[in-house]
Structure formats: structure tokens, C-alpha cells
Regions:
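Glycine-rich phosphate-binding loops of nucleotide-dependent enzymes
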Residues: 2-278
Length: 278
């Protein structure tokens, strides 16, 4: 692996009985870049995330995660909590905040790994030792910084479930970032957002990429988001990779247009309203 290659997926196959959800998929994601995974509904995109984050164990394949200065780890061999500790963060298609907890508390909970280490796995926390108190104070400060960054600091004490939908989406990304990931996996973060909210999301993701230098894996159906912010795009159809390259090359790939529009499509440029930007 090169020094900037963060994730390498090799020959990933995921079967559910006789159904092949992912079929011999290989691609890589680079540190400091946004890699989008797109494809029609049912193409297997979320299944990839479930394999990367330990929800599923792949039938076949190697998932190599390599952070500069550390030994590579193989995600297919690891449990989900160990994958999170290794530096892989994730959001979900359906928002999974803790709705009855405050906005601030949702971001503090995301830092549980560091708080547990500071508490010697609850001993220091139980007795209120200074190391744990300092870590708890740092967690509150870090959470507050993220709330300020996404414009939700005035809502810190509000229940997360009371926030408007777009704010909940941003809060979920901030919560994932509070785990301090090296690879951030975002599953349809623009789902349900209006045009202004999508534009704000684009700016937030660019800022995360440029400020923190992490790798971002993005599953998204909103092609305006994908084409505006992605450095690299992988296209799936029925679990197989059909294209892999820059936004420009993918947009004009006949195989991609065929997957979205059908066999009879004109493969010159995607027509307006097709879901692929012209």
C-alpha cells in the first residue's frame, strides 16, 4: 500500500444464502480524499459499509485499513467495537441519534473510548479521580467545538429528537467526528435535505476533508452532492463494480448511464432529469 492509501478492498464478496449482494469488489480509498460509492437501489452499497464496520463478516475478501505510523489491520477479522477504536467512524441511512439525550450529550457519548481509557475502565470514574475529571472536561469542550462548527451550539441543551431533520443530519456527522476517525463512512447524509441544506452539507464535508485530512467514504443518491465534492467515484450495479475513476470519467461512462437509464439510453451525455448531471 502507498503511504496515502487508507483503505484497500480486495475481492470483497458477500452472500446471503443464494443471493450475491457484493460480487468480487475491489477498490481503494485515499487519505485526504472523498470517495463516493454510487449505484441504483439494491446495488449493495450499504452492504459494503456493513462489511467495513463489522456488522457483517464478508464471505470472501480482504479489507486492509492502514494509518500512517501504524501497522495495517484487516477489518474483516475484527469486531465492530475494535474497528471503531482503529479509527473507522460511521453514520447510517436512518438517523440513529439518542433522541431523549441532549444535543451535547450525544457528542460526549461518541467519545466513550477516550473516557473509558481515562477512567481505567470505570475505576477512576467511580472514584472521581482527576484524570477522569480532566478527560470529561475535555470531552465537553471538544463536543462544544463541534456544535459551534455545525451551528448548533445554542441548541446544546435541547433534546436531539426535537431538532429539525437537517440539523439532526449534521449532528450525526459531528457525532461521528467526535470519535476522531481516520476514515469516515457516511451513508446517504443528504437524504431528505433541501437544496440549501445539501449545499451546507457539501461545505461541511469539504471542510472536514481539508481541515482534518481524513478519508471519507460516501454513499449518496444526490448526484449534485456526489459530483460537487467527490475526488473519486466507484459505481456498483447488482453488487458488481462497473466504473471507478474521477467524477468526469464516471459521468460519461456508458456503463454508468446504462445502469441508471437502461439499455436504450443515448450514451453521449446523461439527459437532464436523469439523475446524472450533464
Amino acid at each position: 500500500m502507498t503511504v496515502t492509501e487508507l483503505l484497500r478492498v480486495e475481492h470483497l464478496t458477500m452472500k446471503f444464502g443464494g443471493l450475491v449482494a457484493i460480487d468480487d469488489l475491489s477498490f481503494s480509498a485515499t487519505q485526504g480524499e472523498i470517495t463516493a460509492i454510487i449505484g441504483p437501489n439494491g446495488a449493495g452499497k450499504t452492504t459494503i459499509f456493513n462489511c467495513l464496520t463489522g456488522f457483517y463478516k464478508p464471505t470472501i475478501g480482504r479489507l486492509t485499513f492502514s494509518v500512517l505510523g501504524r501497522d495495517p489491520v484487516y477489518l474483516e477479522r475484527m469486531e465492530g467495537f475494535r474497528i471503531a477504536r482503529a479509527g473507522v467512524g460511521r453514520t447510517f441511512q436512518n438517523i440513529r441519534l439518542f433522541p431523549a439525550m441532549s444535543v451535547l450529550e450525544n457528542l460526549i457519548v461518541a467519545q466513550h473510548n477516550e473516557l473509558m481509557r481515562a477512567s481505567f475502565f470505570s475505576v477512576a470514574g467511580l472514584f472521581g479521580l482527576s484524570r477522569y475529571r480532566d478527560a470529561e472536561s475535555d470531552a465537553v469542550k471538544f463536543a462544544s467545538q463541534w456544535l459551534d462548527r455545525i451551528g448548533l451550539l445554542p441548541d446544546a441543551d435541547r433534546q436531539a429528537g426535537e431538532l429539525p431533520y437537517g440539523d439532526q443530519r449534521r449532528l450525526e456527522i459531528a457525532r461521528a467526528m467526535c470519535s476522531k476517525p481516520t476514515l469516515l463512512c457516511l451513508d446517504e447524509p443528504a437524504a431528505g435535505l433541501n437544496r440549501n441544506e445539501s449545499a451546507a452539507l457539501n461545505e461541511l464535508l469539504r471542510n472536514i476533508r481539508d481541515t482534518y485530512g481524513i478519508g471519507i467514504l460516501l454513499i449518496e443518491h444526490d448526484m449534485s452532492v456526489v459530483m460537487n465534492i467527490s475526488d473519486h467515484i466507484v459505481v456498483l450495479d447488482y453488487g458488481k463494480k462497473i466504473s471507478d475513476g474521477s467524477p468526469v470519467s464516471v459521468r460519461h461512462d456508458p456503463r454508468v448511464i446504462r445502469a441508471y437509464l437502461g439499455e436504450e439510453a443515448d450514451y453521449g451525455l446523461a439527459p437532464i432529469g436523469s439523475g446524472l448531471p450533464c
